[in-house]
């Protein structure tokens, strides 16, 4: 059974001046296709249950680069419920991550994903954030160990801005056994 996602397309504003939005329901669907391709290795699928265009979030550009603060502000705009909340936001200057999530879906299953400009990059970042909601941690790379680095750089959960989409057997088992997947019949 696919896991339902409630999508909030959330443009930014600063001092009342609305910035042009980058996400649309169509780009969200295309990115979700990439997400589902990546997670198909674990036989986990996601579906958009709702896709809502949000009122712009009026927040100074300088405040957006703190990923946990931004996630808290986005999540505070909606009461927690039984849905997984995904906030799709414009690209953010000086943000060193593709988005942010509440690890292990605590206090609620919520993530934001910033715009990267193409379906594959958007979907890979989104798949990474869903990994955190399914209890997966970042993969650290020891670049002095070339063999390990060559393998891990391709992993979906590699920390930072990467293009990896691989999952290990251990990651697949952890995701399938996560509270989030079990909640939706996985």
Model-derived features with residue positions:
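Short, solvent-exposed loop/turn elements at domain surfaces
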Residues: 12-20, 94-97, 164-171
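Active-site-proximal beta-strand/loop segments in catalytic clefts of secreted hydrolases
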Residues: 8-12, 49-51, 87-92, 115-117, ...
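Active-site-proximal segments of metallohydrolase catalytic domains
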Residues: 43-112, 116
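Extracellular structured ligand-interaction cores
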Residues: 2, 81-83, 154
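The catalytic-center signature of Zn2+-dependent metalloproteases
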Residues: 114-186
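Glycine-rich, flexible loop segments associated with nucleotide phosphate handling
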Residues: 21-30, 77, 148-155
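Fold-level signature of zinc-dependent metallopeptidase catalytic domains
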Residues: 1-39, 44, 55, 91
């Amino acid at each position: 059974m696919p896991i339902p996602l409630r999508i909030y397309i959330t443009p930014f504003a600063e001092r009342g001046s609305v910035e042009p939005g980058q996400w649309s329901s169509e780009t969200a669907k295309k990115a979700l296709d990439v997400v589902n391709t990546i997670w198909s290795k674990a036989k986990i699928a996601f579906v958009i249950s709702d896709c809502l265009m949000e009122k712009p979030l009026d927040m100074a550009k300088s405040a957006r680069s703190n990923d946990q603060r931004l996630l808290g502000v986005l999540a505070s705009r909606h009461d927690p419920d039984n849905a997984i909340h995904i906030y799709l936001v414009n690209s953010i200057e000086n943000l060193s991550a593709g988005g942010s999530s509440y690890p292990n879906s605590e206090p609620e299953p919520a993530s934001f994903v910033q715009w990267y400009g193409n379906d594959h990059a958007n979907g890979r970042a989104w798949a990474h954030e869903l990994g955190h909601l399914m209890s997966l941690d970042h993969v650290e790379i020891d670049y002095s160990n070339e063999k390990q680095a060559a393998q891990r750089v391709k992993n979906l959960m590699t920390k930072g801005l990467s293009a990896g989409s691989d999952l290990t057997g251990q990651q697949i088992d952890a995701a399938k056994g996560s509270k989030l997947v079990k909640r939706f019949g996985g």
